[in-house]
């Protein structure tokens, strides 16, 4: 059995957004730490971080209804949405920091402003969405969220979803107009460029 003589302070498995972000954070905190990063595919960011393999919403909790489950008592728990959104805000701050430090790091290449819409039908789902909206609206992270049951307004928010619908069908939607779409594969590549010759 061959014994490797390579030594490193930190071994990271996976060259996606999480592995590269961890490598970046470590190097920013202590540039002397030796990191080895391994990826089984032929390039970084091709599995879960790849644009077509990921929702790309930034997982900000704006439109992910499963982040605000309703309990058996009928109460909606928004805690997960608040936690996820605050973590996403930290990601945005870190990318802003990298952008100020490295000229090659341009968040505009992987972040696009994209409204986040949740659309529901029927009394039960509309009641859930309205309760969710009223709870989230109270928190500063969700202050820009809007709610509507007006079909014309919803058509302006998400026109393709409303065409040809039954005029008598009850519908409701929420929108956060300052949502984002993230290409985590491209973000992985941008972070890797800041790590060139460092790991």
Q: Which residues fall in each region the model found?
A:
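Glycine-rich FAD pyrophosphate-binding loop
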Residues: 27-51
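Dinucleotide-binding Rossmann-like beta1-alpha1 core, especially the glycine-rich loop
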Residues: 56-156
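Helical element adjacent to the flavin cofactor pocket in flavoenzyme catalytic cores
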Residues: 171-199
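A short, basic/flexible loop-to-alpha-helix module at the beginning of a structural domain
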Residues: 1-8
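Short hydrophobic segments within beta-strands
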Residues: 13, 38, 119-120, 177
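N-terminal Rossmann-like FAD-binding beta1-loop-alpha1 element of flavoenzymes
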Residues: 8-36
């Amino acid at each position: 059995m061959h014994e490797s003589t390579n030594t490193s302070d930190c071994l990271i498995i996976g060259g996606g957004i999480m592995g590269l972000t961890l490598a970046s954070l470590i190097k920013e905190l202590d540039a002397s730490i030796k990191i080895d990063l391994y990826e089984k595919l032929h390039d970084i960011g091709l599995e879960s971080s790849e644009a077509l393999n990921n929702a790309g919403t930034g997982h900000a909790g704006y439109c992910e209804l499963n982040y605000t489950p309703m309990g058996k008592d009928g109460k909606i728990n928004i805690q997960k949405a608040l936690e996820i959104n605050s973590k996403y805000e930290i990601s945005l701050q870190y990318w802003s920091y990298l952008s100020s430090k490295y000229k090659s790091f341009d968040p505009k290449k992987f972040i696009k402003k994209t409204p986040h819409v949740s659309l529901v039908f029927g009394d039960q789902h509309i009641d859930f969405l309205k309760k969710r909206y009223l709870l989230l609206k109270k928190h500063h992270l969700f202050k820009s969220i809007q709610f509507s049951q007006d079909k014309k307004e919803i058509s302006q928010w998400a026109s393709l979803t409303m065409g040809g619908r039954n005029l008598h069908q009850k519908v409701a939607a929420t929108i956060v107009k300052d949502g984002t779409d993230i290409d985590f594969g491209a973000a992985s590549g941008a972070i890797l460029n800041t790590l060139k010759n460092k790991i």
